[in-house]
């Protein structure tokens, strides 16, 4: 039996990137901190960024990003957000 893969999206603000294949994306963490980065357009759907859930605890979700955040050098490929910021595609 195989597990069904569901796409998970993070609510964010999307604007035009520097190149035709990317968009500038800004988002908030669970504490209201502001973060941004440039992400491939293939990772964006209806103004939301496709992410992977790494961990969940109560109403918080640690998500992996399909790229790096500008404000977090090194380990900027994940962010903790509120569950209400996440949409799971059926």
Where are these regions (language model features)?
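Basic/aromatic-rich interaction segments and small domains that mediate binding to polyanionic partners
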Residues: 3-86
């Amino acid at each position: 039996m195989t597990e069904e893969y569901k796409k998970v999206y993070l609510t964010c603000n999307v604007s035009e990137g520097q190149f035709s294949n990317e968009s500038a994306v800004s988002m908030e963490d669970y504490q209201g901190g502001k973060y941004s980065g440039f992400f491939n357009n293939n990772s964006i759907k209806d103004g939301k960024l496709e992410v992977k859930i790494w961990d969940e605890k109560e109403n918080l979700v640690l998500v992996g990003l399909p790229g790096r955040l500008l404000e977090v050098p090194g380990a900027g490929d994940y962010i903790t957000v509120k569950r209400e910021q996440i949409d799971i595609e059926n």
